[in-house]
Each structure stands twice: as C-alpha cells, then as structure tokens.
C-alpha cells in the first residue's frame, strides 16, 4: 500500500493536534524522522522490517502510535504494540493511548496483560467472604492456600466492591489498595489453576473480558512473551497477516525468544515415580467418575502402567548416569561441552521425548472431555479433577519440551546448552536437567519476520559499540532481507547538560580486588553524599554480592538508601520521588534492572553511580557454551559476546541521567579500565559525548577479604 496524500495529511493533522495537548511540547527533528520512517515501513513503501533506535527524548511511543493507527485504519488491520515490561505496557495503555483518544475520539484500544496480572474473581470472592462456605471453595483449588486474616478479608472485600462496582478493572497495578505479593499470589491464578469456561465467574472474569476486547480493538498493547506465544498457537491475537506489529524495547526480544527455548525440570527418580503414580490414579478416577465418550487406548490400566514404568526406568537410568558425571559433593553441576550428550544419554532423551509427549496427549484428551461435562455431575468433584488434570498436562508439556530440546544437536545453527545439577532442598537431594538454545534467529524468522508483513523494532538502545551487528546476529534481522536499521540523533546537548566522572581508583574491580575496590567506591560515594550537592542519586551494581558488600560499608547511612528488594520497585521510586520533592536526600540502589525503565527527571536524579563495567557472568553454562561454539568458528568470544553485552549495559546505565532538556548532573563510573584498557575507549565512544573528569579518591585502608566461594547457577 502506498502512503496516499490523504494518509499523510491525516498523520500530519494528528501530530499537529497532539502538540496542543502536551504542555511545553517541543517539536523535534528526530521525532518527525521517526514518524516518517515508521509510516513508510508499515505502509510497505520501504523495506521489510525497521529497527530504529530512538534515544530518550525523541518521543518514540507517540512516533509509532500516530502513523501506526492511521495505517491500521486504512488497511483495516490491528496495531499490536508489544513491550518487555509491565511498566511501559501500562504507561502506553493508561497514559499515551488515552492522550491520543483526545484527538482521535473514536479510538478503540485494550491491553493484553499476562494472566498473573489480573485478579481471579473466584479467589477474590472466597477471600473477601467471612462465610466459611465461601472459603471452603478454595480448599480443593489449592491445598497450600492459607486462610486469610481479618485485615486481609476486609481488604479483599474492598477490592471485590470496586470490581463489582466497575471502579476497578482487576489489574493489580490499577488499584490504590495495597496488595503484598503473598496476598496477590492467592488472589490471582495461573493457567493450571484456571477453570476457564467451566468457571462460574467466566463471563465477568477481568482476564477473559480483556481477551474478548481484543477482537474489537484497533490497538492492542501486549508483551513480547504473549506475542511469541500467540504467534506459536495462533490464538489471542488476529492472524499475523492482519497485524501491524511494533516491538518496543525490542532489544529484549532475543532473550524472550530464548526463554521459550529454555527448559528446566526436576528428574529426581523418587519424585518422578510419585508424579507418575499420581497421574495413573487421576486417570483411574476420571475413568470411574467421569468416563469419556471415547476411551483413549492408553487409558487402559495395564497399558498406562507399562508406559509409566518405562518412563520411570529411563529416568532412573538417566539419574544414575548423570550422578556419575557430577562431582561427589552433595550440591554439584555438570555441563556437557558444546551441548553434546553421550550417545547413551541422547538415546534416553529421544525416547523420553516420545513417551512424555504421549502422556501429554492423554492428559489433554481427558481435559478436553472433562471441560465438556454437564452440570449433572458433582461440580466440586469435577472441578477438582479438572484442576489436577490441568496440572498434569502442564507437567508433561514441560517434560516433553525439555526432552525434545535435549534431543536437538543444534537450534538456529548453534548448539543447545545442556547441563545437570544436584542440590539440597529441605534436606533432600534433587536432580535437575536444563537445556537452553543459545541462538533463536530461526524461531524469530518463523514466528515473526516471515509471518508478519511489516514490523517495527524500536528501543532507546538497540546498538552496542555503535553497531547493530549484535542485534542482527541475535535476532536474525538482516539488510539482505530488506530490513532497515536507523539510529536517530539524541535531542539533548550532553556536553552542556552533564559530565562523566571516572575517579582515580587504585584497584580494578576484579573478583580478586573486589573488597578493596568496593571500599574505595564506598569512600568516594560517602564523600559525595556528605557534600549534599545532590538530592536524587542512583547507585547501580553488576551483582547482588557486590551490592551487599557496599551496603555493609555504608551501613551508617542505610536510612537514606532505598535498596532493590526492600519493597516493590514502584514503591521505592514513589518514596524516592516524595523524599526529593520535599527537599530530602534520597538514594536508589539496585542492579541492572534499575538501569532500564527508570525515568527520573530534573532534581529527582542528578548523580548516577556505576559500580563497574557489567560483563556477562563467566560461570553461566549458557555463556560458556556460546564461548566454546564461537571459538570453534575461530571467533573471539570477548569481541562477539562479552564486549557488546557490556557496552549495551553501560549505555543503558548512563542513559538514566539525562531524561529531558532540564536535566543536569553527572555519571560516576568506578572502573579505571575505561581509561587503561584498549577496549575502554570503544566503550566510551558508544556513550553520549560528556566531558570527562578524574577526581582523586579518599585514602582507604582495608584488609583483603577471603575470596568468595563461587556460586552455582541454578
């Protein structure tokens, strides 16, 4: 479809009208360029897909929504906007689209959040009730569900009143009533515990109401995991050919796709025997109490017992073999080099893939039949069996995927990382098996790039080391296929608005020098804190261990620090904002996740402290396998893997400081390798251009601490 004069005029008119809706709106050339590039791509005028890096301040969300909505209407398609986290998803749904509705009055939009973000009305009704009969409803749903106390009951009653009175849409983030994680776990549900159409509350269930709204919406705000799952199952969203797709925070997409290719499951022989026995009893119960119209052949007790016995024998053999490979210690790990399994193990995995898939099919067959049973049955008993069968289906589905992945030599032309772990839980030894595909470009090509005609991949950070090459390798997007890669200029004057401070540290932040380095860092940080020049500060760490050691060094000012994990992130940010706005000092302290999606403008954040260059963990089985594979191809893992990842992380961390034209401040990086190593200048060149200062660090005397024990990845 060509961009007609009428369509261009519509986009221009909406953009002009938008300026009247936003106070102090500043027209920006990068924003106009992005609108034009997005429009040309979605209309099919130029290229297949577009990867466009839009730095903070460009206004990327509105830059893709305006042309996206206009073209979706013209082509009678649905615009799907996908994000990587709930915060941005909710911002688009609750802020950006309502703003656009002021200039596009008939705009229809909805959000497709994950099931776990919505309240389960069945659970809410039971927890809100003071009637024992209502609470008894939950007895068969969750054996571990703890009874609510009076305070929780009152809170749930208020939530139920808001839900029934249409004052609340059922989303956790859309209520002012405080809900801690433990209570929300009981108020929400997951796929295995959902009765779906069999539930008495199905018609008014917030989750299913939202899913039904998708069919009528012009714009659907989703997340990457849901989009990937929807493309795989052809459910939830319209057909790919009827979509316009925008992947915001698109740098996360390869990781989300990799998560779909990451399987871990317990394979302890005794545990597995218990699960198989429970499933056999469940099948027998279903046959006796809710006999299906057509009996699956495998439901025959003798056949099922023989089938399960073969599964168990294979699992027991695999346990014995894996225990020979793992060290003698109770907690141990063994990774298979290049993901290559011994022939004996590979044969077991291939056989288990077939056997567990057959059990998955049997559970699915029973579940489909149970879901069609009429009200003539005991509803509580029926629902109990449905939920138990749902759980069995989920377990065998996960097992089937695990063994299929274990049976693969390669995925997307790269090895599948495979390893086993043995660990102690509640005094008992447990064995787990893990598989992760280290490349996902084939999956993305099949589900997205080949299926959806035109896709926009955007983020404030898509490049590392000033190059799109890492994104291209991980995602499978390529110029040869007609994909375009655009990097927009930042609208900010970083030279005038900030500076980069690299203190003259005596120690590099290596594992051997960690104690001395953190002591130096704490001394400089304390000096900055005592100067009282900055009210809003952020301290970012590459590891939880380093963060905890730092906190020990500054324990006397702990009350000023708002530390990741103390409370939910949104509450920490809210408290930080209140403190600074009331004239107090406040310091947010967190890990890499705090380097993304944190938007604190002006005085709310004027100094960012970065512990060190965040290279990927060297003890990760996935990273090690990828390194082995790269070496086998005569490629240097540090150049292909570690340095681009570190560059990307550093760009995001530094990007927390300048969020608007009014922002002023400095970024402190406690890593002298930026100035002493050959790669340091390359990392600096990929950052915004700041003037650099190198102040002295206070003298610190610290005794070297014993080298910390290496932690296993689980």
From Swiss-Prot:
Pfam family, one: DEAD
Motif extent (DEAH box): 248-251
Residues involved in ATP binding: 54-61
Keywords: 4Fe-4S, ATP-binding, DNA-binding, Helicase, Hydrolase, Iron, Iron-sulfur, Isomerase, Metal-binding, Nucleotide-binding
Enzyme Commission (EC) number: 5.6.2.3
Cofactor: [4Fe-4S] cluster
PROSITE patterns per UniProt: HELICASE_ATP_BIND_2, HELICASE_CTER
Gene3D superfamilies named among the record's database cross-references: P-loop containing nucleotide triphosphate hydrolases (3.40.50.300)
Domain (Helicase ATP-binding): residue spans on this chain: 17-294
Co-factor binding details: Binds 1 [4Fe-4S] cluster.
Helicase C-terminal domain location: 517-698
InterPro entries on file: ATP-dep_Helicase_C, DEAD/DEAH_box_helicase_dom, DinG/Rad3-like, DinG_proteobact, Helic_SF1/SF2_ATP-bd_DinG/Rad3, Helicase-like_DEXD_c2, Helicase_ATP-bd, P-loop_NTPase
GO biological process: one example: DNA repair
Stored PANTHER family: ATP-DEPENDENT DNA HELICASE DING, DNA REPAIR DEAD HELICASE RAD3/XP-D SUBFAMILY MEMBER
Job of this protein: DNA-dependent ATPase and 5'-3' DNA helicase. Unwinds D-loops, R-loops, forked DNA and G-quadruplex DNA.
Protein name (record): ATP-dependent DNA helicase DinG
Source organism of the structure: Salmonella choleraesuis (strain SC-B67)
């Amino acid at each position: 479809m060509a961009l007609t004069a009428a369509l261009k005029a519509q986009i221009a008119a909406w953009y002009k009208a938008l300026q009247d809706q936003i106070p102090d709106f500043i027209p920006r050339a990068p924003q106009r360029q992005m609108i034009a590039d997005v429009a040309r791509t979605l209309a099919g005028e130029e290229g297949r897909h577009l990867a466009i890096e839009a730095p903070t301040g460009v206004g990327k969300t509105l830059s893709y929504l305006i042309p996206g909505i206009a073209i979706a209407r013209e082509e009678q398609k649905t615009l799907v906007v996908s994000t990587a986290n709930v915060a941005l998803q909710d911002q688009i749904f609750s802020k950006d689209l309502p703003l656009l509705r002021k200039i596009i009055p008939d705009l229809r939009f909805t959000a497709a959040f994950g099931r776990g973000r919505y309240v389960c009305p069945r659970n809410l009704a039971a927890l809100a009730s003071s009637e024992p009969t209502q609470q008894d409803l939950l007895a068969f749903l969750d054996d571990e569900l703890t009874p609510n106390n009076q305070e929780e009951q009152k809170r749930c009653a208020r939530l139920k009143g808001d839900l029934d009175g249409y004052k609340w849409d059922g989303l956790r983030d859309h209520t002012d009533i405080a809900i801690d994680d433990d209570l929300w776990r009981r108020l929400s549900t997951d796929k295995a515990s959902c009765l779906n159409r069999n539930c008495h509350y199905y018609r008014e269930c917030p989750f299913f109401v939202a899913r039904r709204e998708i069919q009528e919406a012009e714009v659907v705000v989703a997340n990457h995991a849901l989009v990937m799952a929807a493309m795989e199952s052809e459910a939830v969203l319209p057909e790919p050919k009827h979509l316009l797709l925008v992947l915001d925070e698109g740098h996360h997409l390869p990781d989300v796709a990799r998560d779909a290719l990451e399987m871990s499951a317990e394979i302890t022989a005794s545990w597995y025997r218990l699960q198989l026995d429970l499933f056999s009893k469940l099948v027998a119960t279903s046959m006796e109490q809710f006999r299906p119209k057509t009996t699956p052949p495998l439901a025959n007790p003798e056949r099922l017992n023989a089938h399960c016995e073969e599964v168990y024998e294979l699992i027991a053999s695999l346990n014995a073999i894996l225990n020979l490979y793992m060290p003698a210690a109770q907690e141990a790990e063994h990774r298979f080099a290049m993901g290559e399994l011994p022939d004996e193990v590979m044969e077991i995995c291939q056989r288990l893939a077939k056997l567990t898939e057959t059990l998955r099919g049997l559970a699915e067959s029973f579940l489909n039949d149970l879901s069609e049973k009429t009200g003539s049955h005991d509803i509580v008993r029926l629902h109990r069996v449905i939920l138990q069968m749902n759980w069995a289906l989920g377990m065998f589905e996960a097992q089937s995927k695990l063994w299929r992945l274990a049976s693969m030599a390669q995925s997307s032309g790269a090895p599948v990382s495979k390893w086993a772990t043995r660990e102690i839980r509640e005094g008992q030894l447990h064995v787990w098996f893990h598989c992760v595909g280290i490349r996902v470009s084939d999956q993305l090509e099949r589900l997205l790039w080949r299926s959806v005609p035109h896709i926009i991949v955007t983020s404030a950070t898509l490049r590392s080391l000033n190059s799109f090459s890492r994104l291209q390798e991980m995602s499978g997007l390529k110029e040869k296929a007609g994909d375009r890669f655009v990097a927009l200029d930042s609208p900010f004057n970083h030279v005038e608005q900030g500076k980069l401070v690299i203190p003259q540290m005596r120690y590099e932040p290596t594992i051997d020098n960690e104690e001395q380095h953190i002591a130096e860092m704490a001394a400089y940080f304390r000096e900055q804190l005592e100067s009282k020049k900055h009210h809003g500060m952020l301290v970012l760490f590459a590891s939880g261990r380093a963060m905890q050691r730092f906190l020990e060094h500054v324990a006397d000012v702990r009350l000023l620090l708002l530390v990741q994990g103390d409370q939910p992130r949104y509450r920490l940010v809210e408290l930080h904002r209140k403190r600074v706005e009331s004239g107090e000092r406040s310091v947010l302290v967190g890990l890499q996740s705090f380097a993304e999606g944190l938007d604190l403008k002006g005085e709310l954040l004027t100094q960012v402290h970065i512990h060190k260059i965040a290279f990927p963990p060297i003890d990760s089985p996935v990273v090690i396998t990828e390194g082995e594979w790269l070496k086998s191809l005569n490629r240097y893992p540090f150049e292909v893997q570690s340095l681009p990842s570190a560059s990307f992380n550093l760009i995001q961390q530094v990007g927390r400081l300048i969020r608007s034209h009014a922002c002023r401040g400095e970024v402190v990086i406690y890593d002298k390798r930026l100035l002493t190593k050959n790669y340091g200048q390359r990392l600096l060149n990929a950052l915004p251009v700041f003037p650099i200062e190198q102040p002295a660090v206070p003298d610190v005397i610290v005794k070297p601490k014993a080298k910390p024990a290496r932690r296993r990845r689980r």
